[in-house]
A protein has these predicted regions:
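Helix-loop-strand module that forms the ligand-binding subsite of alpha/beta enzymes
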Residues: 1-62
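Glycine-rich phosphate/pyrophosphate-binding loop and the adjoining helix
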Residues: 65-115
Length: 115
């Protein structure tokens, strides 16, 4: 199982409701040894870089392996239109590259044994 998490910036991190999801779920059964791809979005210039780092720490704690290419999307209101469609070609290319890398990376990873 794989997860793609697109997280907005919230006070320099990721939203607390997302942390609550990990805190209140049955971590071992749901999250352990899964893989995740992170994309951060923000209206500012950093694209939620700090939030993705915080989130990666939480994910690593619950034994989710995080893909190394975390994509920050800055000034999201200028790359996405009011219908939610991406209108910036460079952003679209970066997203497609990240997804292609994740698909390849996830397919090469092996599941740990249950010894």
């Amino acid at each position: 199982s794989h997860f793609i998490i697109i997280s907005p910036e919230y006070n320099g991190s990721f939203p607390g409701v997302l942390k609550m999801l990990f805190d209140t779920s049955r971590s071992h059964e749901i999250w352990f040894h899964k893989k995740a791809l992170l994309t951060g979005v923000a209206t500012g210039r950093a694209g939620n870089l700090r939030g993705m780092d915080h989130l990666a720490d939480v994910l690593n704690y619950v034994k989710i392996t995080v893909h190394p290419n975390k994509l920050p999307i800055s000034a999201v209101n200028s790359v996405v239109n009011s219908d939610g469609k991406i209108i910036d070609n460079n952003t679209l290319k970066a997203i497609n590259q990240q997804l292609d890398e994740f698909i390849l990376w996830a397919s090469l990873q092996t599941q740990p044994s249950n010894h």
